[in-house]
Amino acid sequence: MDNNVEYELKEVSIQEGGSNLNINTPSGMSDGDFNSGANSPDIVKSENDFDKLAESLEKESKQYFAAQDNENNAGESEEDFKLRRYFENSQRMALSNGSKPKKMSICIRNLTVVGRGADLSVIADLLTPFNWFISLFKPSTWKIEKTSTFNILNNVTCFNRDGQMLLVLGRPGAGCSTLLRLISNQRGSYISVDGDIKYGGIPAKEWERYKGEAIYTPEEDSHHPTLTVRETLDFALKCKTIHNRLPDEKKVTFREKISSLLLSMFGIVHQADTIVGNEYIRGLSGGERKRLTITEAMVSSASITCWDCSTRGLDAASALDYAKSIRIMSDTLHKTSIASFYQASDSIYNLFDNVLVLEKGRCIYFGPVGQAKQYFLDLGFDCEPRKSVPDFLTGVTNPQERIIRKGFEGRVPETSADFEQAWKASELCREMERQQTEHEKKIEVEQPHLDFIEEVRANKSKTNTKTSVYTTSFPTQVRALIVRHSQIIWGDKFSLVSRYLSVIIQSFVYGSVFYNMQTNLSGLFTRGGAIFAAILFNAFLSEGELFATFYGRRILQKQQSYAMYRPSAFHIAQVVTDIPLTTVQVFLFSIVVYFMFGLQYEAGKFFIFCFTLIGATLATTNMFRAFGNLSPSLYVSQNVMTGILIFMISYCGYSIPKNKMHPWFGWFFWANPFTYAFKALMANEFMDLNFSCETEAIPYGTDPTTGAPYDNSVRVCASAGSRPNTLEVKGSDYLMDALTFKSDDRTLNIFITYLWWVLFIIINMVAVEYLEWTSGGFTTKTYKKGKAPKLNDAEEERKQNEIVAKATSEMKDTLKMRGGVFTWENIKYTVPVGKTQKLLLDDVEGWIKPGQMTALMGSSGAGKTTLLDVLAKRKTLGTVQGKTFLNGKALEIDFERITGYVEQMDVHNPGLTVREALRFSAKLRQEPSVSLEEKYDYVEHVLEMMEMKHLGDALVGTLETGVGISVEERKRLTIGVELVAKPHILFLDEPTSGLDAQSSYNIVKFIRKLADAGMPLVCTIHQPSSVLFEHFDRILLLAKGGKTVYFGDIGERSKTLTSYFERQGVRPCTEFENPAEYILEATGAGVHGKTEINWPEVWKQSPELQEVRRELSSLEASGSSSSSNENGVPREFATSIWYQTWEVYKRMNVIYFRDPFYAYGSILQAVMTGIIVGFTFWDLKDSSSDMNQRIFFIFQALLLGILLIFVVMVQFLVQKEYFKRDYASKFYSWFPFAISIVLVEIPYTIVCGSVFFFCSFWTAGLFMEGQNGANFYFWIIFIIYLFFCVSFGGAIAAVCNHMFLAMTLVPLLIVFLFLFCGVMVPPSQIPTFWKGWVYHLNPCRYFMEGIITNVLEHQKVNCSYEDLTKFNNPTTLTCEEYFVPATGYVTNTTSDNSECGYCIFNSGEQYYKTLEWDASNKGRSIAILIAFWMFNIFLVVSFVYLTRKPSR
């Protein structure tokens, strides 16, 4: 069939098709009807009449597609016809129900998009703030520099009719993704957008009111890993279920039918109850996760869908099935579909109506798919046999790939500007311009947007406002989100159980520390500590919400762009699910601690205790979320939150009474959620409680005038709240005198605690609605200063082309690889699934030889990646059976090092540039005998070959932040990292997945050169073009279940391969057909692929298998005697341990230096804490209350170190993931990483400690005149304590494999650090069980003993009048004569000695003696802290060793 005819037929189909976007289910059609193929629903007569017409149209469609099959094998399958019929019936029923058509075309005129130039996007580092500050004093920098810009898109004009499909093709950097984002109305990341985009006549500005009707689906997959496939899809349906459904059709029925349809359509119905999973949680395969992404986007029911490389990770058959489903939905539902593909087959290409080819942001072709190839042929280019049309269209822009026809040399376009000029001068361009003008006039006359607007309003919930962009109402969104959030939590039962188990364990620890507090003066003091500790416990436990907030940002951004729900609804749902979780948590904690504490045994007080703690926990949880939602970086929010927590702890009334607070920070007492919770809990416990002090009253001993004990009438309690003539302290009096709390305010304080919760809810709702920190699927490159390339410059473009051309012509043909023969035999691999074993690989055998390229193919889920993991010795879980040999010998210890493995996941350290990442690999993995200059030269060669020269000084970055190289560029870097190592054997897992055709061609050609030079390699490949496929020598084809279908030669023009299948009864492969697609079709690959032949059984009976086994035996018997190592001594690592350590340490310093958020975040934390603490405890004097303030000052310093643990732990966990990837490839051993990450923290820790010291030490009045040794001791012991905390955080991170486990473990360990340090609970009151070992093994105890004895050793105490405990003196003796205390001193408070004042201490030494501490132990304290620090380093090294291998 002629391509022009095909185009006209599609036009007819579009004009005759239905017009409603919404997927409505015909009444009477059940799930089983779709799955079984039933197509006779029981409906009214008029519907039957329409069925007859539909059947007639279906026959015509079958005839049309059958004809197309004969030409290009892209016809619809039986399932495709069922799908088409389903949509046609749905459309017909929707129209009969009064629905209006939503025919929204796209018209783009003169679209120019301006982006920020990379020359001013310089990599940030620790010097960036200093450089900025210095620039303020340079007049030459005061003039505002004009930001360099470049055109991402340049004057692009095109259109796409409703119901049509537009294919966007272009090499990386052509602007394809930008165009798709602009069509979906995502404009925020660009400097300017000029030109017009109209949606069915609606301007782009007005289109903002219809968010979700044009969606952009990026190539990466973002899903909640603990949700099942069904739950993920059902949630999307709940948010997008239209109001205008069929009569009497319930929402649940509608969702079930649509869910069943889509799951069947994309072949994941068998995985409906499987969790989605991610890189850490086992779930769907990569291909299945991609299908789920596509399914979720389809549920959005958008009028216009933009698909950006959405087939990445799918095999060729599944990609074709996906494209067919888009074609059917476009035809029947009149969806306007725009898609970009990097490697599209002709079968996929022919499904589209028009194609737009971009190069460097310029349009070089826009028109029918059937005329594109001829257009470029007419320009003077030639197309290789079997080369797909899409590959040809993008290849003509690459000087290394294009073929110029004889006689056209020097006449064809060379640069993007040349191509654009040629296109604009063509007759076809003028014809497309005429068609676009006519279409725009037609839109003005017909005004389809009026029906669109009416239908959009009809589909919305009736409770929605007219301006709402959402389908469902706010309450419906909240309900759906509540269910989903509950499913997310329930899906991760391990985390849920771990959380509650941690709470129970810690509650028993807390309860035992403050066990059975008595109603005496010691119980009076410790009750406040116990209640404060209860609040603090829940605060630390809530910090995990900070990490959860950042983790879910990308998913929230994606679903918000689909207009599924308001972000504020998302937060409300979180709040609602918080309530039962927090209630259970607090109740489990309270039921233990309340009664172990010995608090008042009254039901009312117990439930008030629980209710207040619930409010405080809810408020704290939402406070952490608020700081996460308001911050661009996790490190920023963490460090700011540390300062805020210090503030909250200092100003809640526990450590500093209200009347002792200085005015500059005293206001925070009222702006502190902890204040009201603490006041309420203290009032709840103290308001009806009296404390006896008969054994602790003063004066004590014997009256000097009588020789008898002092009469009780003159004795008073030595406590705040004491009153004359009584040996009891009323709790309410104590609250007022000591803390200035009113016990009558309990109810008010509880109410205000919950008001704080509400306030933080509102802040979060506003933050998530109006702030967006994710990149939305795009990346911005940053370069070293002065290293950014020039963009869209014709001369620069020619220069780059010449570099690549030269590199291609000067491929290192003399390169000698030391490859060997690698064989595998009877490979079986099983993994535990529940109580059974699942077989993933079943008797797979084969080999790779020097000089040969072997392709590993099969449908998604066939076990290709699993086989590579097994062969490359990367599997650490499950059971592997079978034999593997290298040169006929068992694999040596150096196998992983000499093997290059390009994995699917592109794991790279974001703090390095591309060149640094490649050089690091070359330095550590090439033989040490190779000079550094040679290694660097080879790196440059690889950069040129892979067209990454211009990216050499670009930061790798991360996709989450949107700063760094793109997805496609990461894949090239992954390959480059392995190639620069000069491996002896190369395994590549989908090296071309996500790459454009030209990059794929370059990579495969480069790999071919490596093979020709003697390297054996095997490569999984999903969607190979005919040209790429012909580079391979052999193929191993797997069926689902890991069974072999074929292993053998491909043959010239694939004849050997295709003849094998033809002999089994498969139709012949045509001359112009892609052999790779042919064999996948023959073996039933794809979503709905079917085959009646049991190919694994056919293979087992084939003579080819017998030949394979004979060859295997021969290869193993004739194995070479040479070792894999040229020196004859296998080494696990190429370089020495000390060289590794030096290189890893240098790299770690670069990474930290380029992470100002982390480094300055820690410093900012120290500055904030130092200023807060210093000015909180401003200029302390020598009164007893000021002495207590000194103790609490040091306690705040203690908390700084503890909070620093959280910050360090996050960084360690991130770096550990990169280490595991490096270790698997034997870059370096576990020891260099462990010791480097410990050493790199030291200077930053010293700076943090010193900053805190200088900000607070003099401010708080702790400087001791003439005691320089004591002043230095304060600094040095604090620095060593911070060393301990940093290494402690590293040890926790080293033993944990993911963040949640670490966040669960940290509070459990921290409780021992601060509870048993000797301040919150004096040593004399610590239970014997804990004191016997935990107290003496607590490093914080030695820090507190050393620093407190140092501060108080020479401190004299002179009580102020307010600090004195007053009692009457009925005698004529002076106060000093009347009562001689054991500690402290007595003084006159009146001139006549009638009233005496007792000061409990007269020196700081007396205080720390009561804690059983001594100043003579200061040296010992430092020594023990150093010992704990060294022990932590030992733990870090040990745990890094034990967890060095990833679980896979």
UniProtKB/Swiss-Prot annotation:
Keywords: ATP-binding, Membrane, Nucleotide-binding, Repeat, Transmembrane, Transmembrane helix, Transport. Residues 490-717, 1157-1389 form the ABC transmembrane type-2 domain. Pfam families: ABC2_membrane (PF01061), ABC2_membrane_7 (PF19055), ABC_tran (PF00005), ABC_trans_N (PF14510), PDR_CDR (PF06422). It comes from the Eukaryota. It is found in: Membrane. Residues 16-28 have a biased composition (Polar residues). It is a multi-pass membrane protein. Its main location: membrane. One of its GO terms (cellular component) is membrane. Residues 16-41 are annotated as: Disordered. Residues 136-385, 822-1066 form the ABC transporter domain. PANTHER family: ATP-BINDING CASSETTE TRANSPORTER (PTHR19241). Belongs to the ABC transporter superfamily. ABCG family. PDR (TC 3.A.1.205) subfamily. This is ABC transporter G family member 9. It comes from Dictyostelium discoideum (Social amoeba).
